[in-house]
């Protein structure tokens, strides 16, 4: 019986559970999900990729990544998944009728983020704001890091905490700027 106690305690505590620790995800029905590990395989541009989460947070992607510190009105997901692999954060919005207040709030998260001193002289930080109409209809805002997705029905300041606590967590901690893709609305000032 004595040898069973640690196992029972482990089971009671969710010992083999890979869920995230309890955290206040703000309002807006926010939820954070850990996405099962998938290989970050490089695929030819234009290849159809099926990801295990929506929006995608890990897995196959194009060999090129998008230029950092930009707001993209449109960007193929396979580019921004590569940005995640490099330790970046992608802030997404889905507003078919437009949502300038939400977009401005996401841009403020990027503008007020600390300068990445490891990337000094290359980029301010490794963040993007991207419109993503492929997200589920009930998701207006998402924040994505390699292997982690926060989704919500509206903007909540929790987005900034998600970005701050998961920044530079990708398997390739690289500062190199990506390619300035078409669809970029603005570049963030240094």
What are these regions (language model features)?
Residues 1-7:
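Sec-dependent signal peptide recognition
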Residues 14-16:
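Bacterial signal peptide processing site
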Residues 46, 79, 86, 124, ...:
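Sequence-level motif detector for i,i+2 pairs with an aromatic at +2
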Residues 6, 20-22, 167-169:
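Residue-level signal for mature regions of secreted extracellular proteins and peptides
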Residues 20-81, 103:
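Surface-exposed, low-hydrophobicity interaction/linker segments
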Residues 112-190:
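Helix-rich interaction surfaces within compact, conserved domain-sized segments
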Residues 10-12:
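C-terminal motif of bacterial Sec signal peptides marking the signal peptidase cleavage site
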Residues 73-120:
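Mid-length scaffold segments of soluble, non-membrane domains
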């Amino acid at each position: 019986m004595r040898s069973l106690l640690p196992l029972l305690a482990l089971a009671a505590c969710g010992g083999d559970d890979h869920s995230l620790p309890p955290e206040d995800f703000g309002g807006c029905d926010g939820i954070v999900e850990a996405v099962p590990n998938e290989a970050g395989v490089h695929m030819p541009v234009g290849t159809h990729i099926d990801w295990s989460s929506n929006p995608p947070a890990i897995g196959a992607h194009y060999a090129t990544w998008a230029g950092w510190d930009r707001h993209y009105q449109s960007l193929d997901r396979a580019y921004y998944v590569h940005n995640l692999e490099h330790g970046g954060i992608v802030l997404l919005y889905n507003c078919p009728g437009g949502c300038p207040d939400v977009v401005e709030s996401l841009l403020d998260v990027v503008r007020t983020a600390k300068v990445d001193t490891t990337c000094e002289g290359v980029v301010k930080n490794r963040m993007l704001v991207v419109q993503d109409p492929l997200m589920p209809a009930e998701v207006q805002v998402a924040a994505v890091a390699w292997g982690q997705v926060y989704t919500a029905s509206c903007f909540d300041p929790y987005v900034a905490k998600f970005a701050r606590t998961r920044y530079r967590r990708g398997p390739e901690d690289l500062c190199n700027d990506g390619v300035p893709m078409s669809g970029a609305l603005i570049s963030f000032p240094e």
